[in-house]
């Protein structure tokens, strides 16, 4: 009787574990089929769109922050005989203008990716899944960075320039060629 009581909770946990894992598998299968599955050409087109939106928003935010900085700098009264941080005041103000536009350029992808998410809300789940799968392929197939040299440079290490299936296949061939050259010459 005591043995049955001890074994029974273990069996119950095993059954419960199977029940939850089975339902999780069904939920994953149902979740992946409920949304529209994104094809690889569609994924690469969306990836290119996201990159263009991010670049455009970077340029726009750099322009806006430079204009805001210019509006502030144009109202500042400076004394040309006084040094700012050990430099001429005009050099410091121009440096501040460039720094503000650089900061705006760096903040641009935040706005661009938010705009991309809103614009492509329906395809976002499939896009994120394909992006994870694509980045796993990149990690698995990229070459070792320690074997690079001037005569044998690395192919695109992060896969940022891959924009189609043909370019992906070419990237795989380039990685294989790099591995072969690194093995032959070392």
From Swiss-Prot:
One Pfam family from the record: Pam17
Cellular localisation: Mitochondrion inner membrane
One GO location term (cellular component): PAM complex, Tim23 associated import motor
Keyword Transport: yes
GO biological process, one term: protein import into mitochondrial matrix
Transit peptide extent on chain: 1-27
InterPro entries to which the protein is assigned, alphabetical: Pam17
Superkingdom, natural source: Eukaryota
Transmembrane segments: 58-78, 93-115
UniProt topology in membrane: Multi-pass membrane protein
Predominant localisation class: mitochondrion
Keyword Membrane: yes
Keyword field: Membrane, Mitochondrion, Mitochondrion inner membrane, Protein transport, Transit peptide, Translocation, Transmembrane, Transmembrane helix, Transport
Protein family according to the UniProt entry: Belongs to the PAM17 family.
Function text: Component of the PAM complex, a complex required for the translocation of transit peptide-containing proteins from the inner membrane into the mitochondrial matrix in an ATP-dependent manner.
Assembly information from the UniProt record: Component of the PAM complex, at least composed of mtHsp70 (SSC1), MGE1, TIM44, PAM16, PAM17 and PAM18.
Protein name, entry field: Presequence translocated-associated motor subunit PAM17, mitochondrial
Gene from which this protein is expressed: PAM17
